[in-house]
């Protein structure tokens, strides 16, 4: 595995059946709070949240296989497979239940499956601008085209990473030069990467500079794009896995959904309904955030996590 240079991995590596995942835990106490990041994000996306939670209890971030500092894992990268690897990782590291599971975007699908499969190990859920399975169980033709485009873009990314084109884009993004970085990405992808600024380049600038350097180096690994492309290509299967795992399950788990102000009306309604599905559910709107709530309003995320932790302390 080629690790990102310039910053030593903050955590440790544990084998989960042929490949090693990076886990970083800080703080002491129970229940342990376990974070799962957005689709192509790493443990670094919790940089502004984890230290504050660690003041109160144990807080653990990790990198899914192929992302961040973790080694590549078997394909396809479905939420169900990832949830199984996460449980293996926690057991290998000696991080015992109960867990408060925190999932951002795609990570919400992973932690919902984990909670449904292991209800007795789960103390609560905090879902941050969560993807919802209903969005992908019956995708429209436009949705399918977008998924196909996402997979295709990841193939371009993997190809660009090998001759070090991605190094140039990463360096420009790290320095805040969005326009030339976006122009290069658009050229590589033949103009189809129309949301590069919002989804990939903008979040980089919300991180401290040292984390920014490491994050952009992650983009220079072909494994990153291969894992991301597999997650995108398998998102409909992941949605089905959530539906099947939760079928007939209990509805009294402490659960908080946090919505972004930029959420579509449909996504907002789904997130509100998800909170109502639990007798101990709660829905919150992050009024000053786009999709990257952990970077825009980390204090709000910390507050909602500790609200659930406090019930179990």
Predicted regions mapped to residue ranges:
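Active-site loop/oxyanion-hole signature of alpha/beta-hydrolase fold enzymes
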Residues: 64-102, 118, 134-146
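Conserved HGGG/HGGXW glycine-rich cap/lid loop of the alpha/beta-hydrolase fold
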Residues: 19-69, 109, 117
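Gly/Ala-rich beta-loop-alpha elbow adjacent to hydrolase catalytic centers
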Residues: 103-107, 111
């Amino acid at each position: 595995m080629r690790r990102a240079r310039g910053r030593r991995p903050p955590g440790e590596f544990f084998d989960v059946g042929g490949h090693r995942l990076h886990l970083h835990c800080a703080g002491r106490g129970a229940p342990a709070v376990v974070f799962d990041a957005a689709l192509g994000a790493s443990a670094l996306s919790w940089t502004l949240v984890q230290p504050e939670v660690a003041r109160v209890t144990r807080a653990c971030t990790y990198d899914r296989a192929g992302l961040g500092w973790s080694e590549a894992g078997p394909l396809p990268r479905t939420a169900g497979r990832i949830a199984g690897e996460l449980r293996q990782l926690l057991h290998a590291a000696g991080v015992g239940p109960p867990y408060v599971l925190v999932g951002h975007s795609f990570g919400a699908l992973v932690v919902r499956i984990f909670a449904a499969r292991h209800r007795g190990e789960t103390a609560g859920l905090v879902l941050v601008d969560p993807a919802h399975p209903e969005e992908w169980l019956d995708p429209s033709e436009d949705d399918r085209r977008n998924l196909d485009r996402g997979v295709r873009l990841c193939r371009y990314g993997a190809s660009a990473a090998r001759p070090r084109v991605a190094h140039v884009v990463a360096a420009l993004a790290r320095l805040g030069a969005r326009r030339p970085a976006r122009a290069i990405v658009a050229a590589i992808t033949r103009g189809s990467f129309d949301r590069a600024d919002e989804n990939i380049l903008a979040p980089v600038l919300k991180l401290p500079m040292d984390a920014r350097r490491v994050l952009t180096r992650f983009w220079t690994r072909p494994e990153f794009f291969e894992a991301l492309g597999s997650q995108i290509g398998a998102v409909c299967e992941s949605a089905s896995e959530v539906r099947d795992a939760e079928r007939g399950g209990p509805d009294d788990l402490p659960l908080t959904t946090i919505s972004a102000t930029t959420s579509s009306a449909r996504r907002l309604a789904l997130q509100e309904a998800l909170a109502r599905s639990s007798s101990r559910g709660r829905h919150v709107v992050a009024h000053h955030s786009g999709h990257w709530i952990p970077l825009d309003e980390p204090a709000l995320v910390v507050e909602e996590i500790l609200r659930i932790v406090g019930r179990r302390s």
